[in-house]
């Protein structure tokens, strides 16, 4: 990677998240917008990326081919769909480019592909790039160690009507943080739906509930409920810029790293708390 500004490429530049990633890249010192990508056939191809994001002219035009911009970036930032992200991952691995991956909804094979690629390139892969959410994950580990064995644990998440995966990647990360603190595997204790005559709640399970409505950016609550009291830890996002800023900050953090798989807690040094 270059010693000067880290040059980033933004996938899905015309989407809601893509435009805010462009804004964040243009605003953060030490980062340079090197490329912006959209799908083949998009009406946005050829547009100026800065103007597309409402940030003024940059001279970076939206392209559809990674090959065409392979010399213009050091780190690829991707918040698109799993199938597209995995294609981008293969390209970045082949060409020695770092990646920041905020895409959610990967199956186990997709996650394994990311782990495999990290042997050759540096990757920050996180379900949520908000500072607050990652502090919350640390708090959940602490709460679970104290209260997790005797309380009923539920995770409730809400997002906008356009979100296509459920539960959210952040909700799953919350469940994994709690399960790990309790020396459990989330696959063995998660309950994702309840309908009809379910019987009494099974002790030791982690329940998930999902809301999809309107323009909710993202709300997540973990509940540790006992008889007579309950603890709720909640994070509410009011703007996607919190995720965009965290992702671009992660790209800058990757400077000088040749390979390895990291998450936002590494970027924020939360693992040492």
Swiss-Prot record:
GO terms for biological process: diaminopimelate biosynthetic process; lysine biosynthetic process via diaminopimelate. Gene3D superfamilies: Dihydrodipicolinate Reductase, domain 2, NAD(P)-binding Rossmann-like Domain. NAD(+) binds at residues 12-17, 38, 102-104, 126-129. Keywords: Amino-acid biosynthesis, Cytoplasm, Diaminopimelate biosynthesis, Lysine biosynthesis, NAD, NADP, Oxidoreductase. GO terms for molecular function: 4-hydroxy-tetrahydrodipicolinate reductase; NAD binding; NADP binding; oxidoreductase activity, acting on CH or CH2 groups, NAD or NADP as acceptor. It is found in: Cytoplasm. The active site is at 159 (proton donor/acceptor), 163 (proton donor). GO terms for cellular component: cytosol. (S)-2,3,4,5-tetrahydrodipicolinate binds at residues 160, 169-170. It comes from the Bacteria. SUPFAM superfamilies: Glyceraldehyde-3-phosphate dehydrogenase-like, C-terminal domain, NAD(P)-binding Rossmann-fold domains. Pathway: Amino-acid biosynthesis; L-lysine biosynthesis via DAP pathway; (S)-tetrahydrodipicolinate from L-aspartate: step 4/4. It catalyses: (S)-2,3,4,5-tetrahydrodipicolinate + NAD(+) + H2O = (2S,4S)-4-hydroxy-2,3,4,5-tetrahydrodipicolinate + NADH + H(+); (S)-2,3,4,5-tetrahydrodipicolinate + NADP(+) + H2O = (2S,4S)-4-hydroxy-2,3,4,5-tetrahydrodipicolinate + NADPH + H(+). NADP(+) binds at residue 39. Catalyzes the conversion of 4-hydroxy-tetrahydrodipicolinate (HTPA) to tetrahydrodipicolinate. HAMAP family: DapB. Belongs to the DapB family. Homotetramer. This is 4-hydroxy-tetrahydrodipicolinate reductase.
